[in-house]
Amino acid sequence: MMKKMTGKSFALSALVAASFMAAGAMASDKTEPRNEVYKDKFANQYNSWHDTAKSEEITDALAGDPSLVILWAGYGFAKDYNAPRGHMYAVTDVRNTLRTGAPTNAEDGPMPMACWSCKSPDVPRLIEEQGEDGYFKGKWAKGGPEVVNTIGCSDCHEKGTPKLRISRPFAERGMEALGTPFDKASKKDKQSMVCGQCHVEYYFEKKDDRKGFVKFPWDSGTTVEQMEAYYDAIEFSDWTHSLSKTPMLKAQHPGYETWKMGVHGKNDVSCVDCHMPKVTNDKGRKYTDHKVGNPFDRFDETCATCHSQSKEFLEGITKERYAKVKELKARAEGQLVKAHFEAAKAWEVGATEAEMKPILTDIRHAQWRWDFAIASHGVAAHAPEEALRILGTAVDKAADARVKLAQLLAKKGVTDAVAIPDISTKAKAQAALGMDMDKMNAEKEAFKKDMLPKWDAEAKKREATYK
């Protein structure tokens, strides 16, 4: 039987508990998440990294291409999708997007904790403190007061040093699946692998013992066909399309994979060579520019170190490639949008699951390939031939689906063309899907007003205990 605690013993217990709580709040031994800690020791790198804040403009990708709303019907990207900005905005943008919803508490909202995984050095800190089981458990809102420092120093570097590291266990496992463990890689390979922690295709596992864990689908390789076969084998889907009822795959941003396929990757030209070149400060000292950006903005330090052609010549070639990719992208989207509406019509007139299965497989594969190509930001520069090849197969598979749909619809007595609603603007496309955008936007504004100040206050209090 427990003895009754005296006032003195109770006070001592409280003191011990408080000390443990304080210790638990300390920054990790391996990870210092606060980027500003390094602003003096690595001033040139810090200041250039901070310049990624100069990409203030928000580009609404759905407004620029309303077909995307239909292609992602039933998924968060149909609500909101902006072009990516600089690293300084990683936490801000994931907080503000409609995709993360408007949670009112730590257990609320549509998205899992895994949605923070590439946004902050607080992520490796949390994994080190809680283990992957603890980190990945729960909803996105659980991480709100914890994940507050944007992508920065400790994501790519060992604590307090320039030495490169992979800071996320799931990325380490991905590299090992390719037979290229980080600790045995060359310096050049490591310069791209640190980018490949996040600029990759990934998915959230659904197994009970690993539910919500991030995984790279590289067990069979990194081509679009190899990953497609992997997903099919495990019967994985990101969501079910609200029109066609297709079990869909959403490509993320497989920049690392497509870079490997292109001429630069094959010739050992790293991400850093083109996007973070060595530059000289006003004292004549060289350092790595951490304002990740377009190589043409620093042509002499990037392209000109290998190419003898002029900036105008190389820019012209790149623009031509972008134009060709954009043209084939639009053709694939046109076929896919029609396929989704035609599939919806087929269900409406009594199509069976057995009749629809081969059609939905074609739609699934076509859109996965289209998405893989367009979500690879920079693919027209990294691997234009591969982008065009993939988009060509997307067009073919979408066309195959539509031929099968035409035959099935005719069998069901539908011989006229299936009507497509007006989706000429983002608003019209969302209205065609019955999306209540006014309600979503109002809820998001309330979340930003009510929850974000609480998250920031809690984070500030916790970080005040750091040494």
UniProtKB/Swiss-Prot annotation:
Catalyzes the reduction of nitrite to ammonia, consuming six electrons in the process. It comes from Shewanella sp. (strain MR-4). Heme c 2 binds at residues 153, 156-157, 290. This is Cytochrome c-552. It catalyses: 6 Fe(III)-[cytochrome c] + NH4(+) + 2 H2O = 6 Fe(II)-[cytochrome c] + nitrite + 8 H(+). It is found in: Periplasm. Heme binds at residues 115, 118-119. Ca(2+) binds at residues 201-202, 250, 252. Its cofactor is Ca(2+); heme c. GO terms for molecular function: calcium ion binding; heme binding; iron ion binding; nitrite reductase (cytochrome, ammonia-forming) activity. The lineage of its organism: Bacteria, Pseudomonadati, Pseudomonadota, Gammaproteobacteria, Alteromonadales. Keywords: Calcium, Electron transport, Heme, Iron, Metal-binding, Oxidoreductase, Periplasm, Signal, Transport. The keyword Nucleotidyltransferase does not apply. Binds 1 Ca(2+) ion per monomer.
